[in-house]
Amino acid sequence: MNRIVRRTLQTAVRTASPWSLGALNHVAIAVPDLDEATSFYRDVLKGDVTGKEDLPEHGVTTVFVNLPNTKIELLYPYGEKSPIAGFLAKNKKGGIHHICIEVDNIKAAMADCEAKGIRLLNKGNLISLIDK
């Protein structure tokens, strides 16, 4: 009995996490024509579409499509060094660039992922992009 309790406790300690997953915040789609994509979501699908927002520090222009339970972020290159331009060079028709899932402790989640060998693309505060 003692061995089982010890093994259970060891497993619990090993699998405990200082952070947990939350809701899906948004799905980001890189698009080759932002006006066409915006028109599609607004006029054809009758989506609640925001205006364009240039984010030169991130090399993107964004438009959000607000859905009842999440958002779609349309991404278009801004400037010559845009990471979206590189993505579109490989994916001419565009496609899903990333998903954003909320966590209850971003710093702990980043540290934990990095410790597990997961490459982090950005170690800064990402809240400014999505907390509108």
Give each language-model segment a name:
Residues 57, 77-80, 100-104, 127-130:
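Short, surface-exposed, polar/charged, turn-prone segments marking secondary-structure boundaries
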Residues 19-22, 29-72, 109-111, 115-123, ...:
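Core segments of cupin and vicinal oxygen chelate
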Residues 9-36, 94-103:
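N-terminal beta-strand motif that seeds the catalytic metal site of vicinal oxygen chelate
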Residues 16-18, 40-41, 87-90:
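A short alpha-helix capping/helix-coil boundary motif
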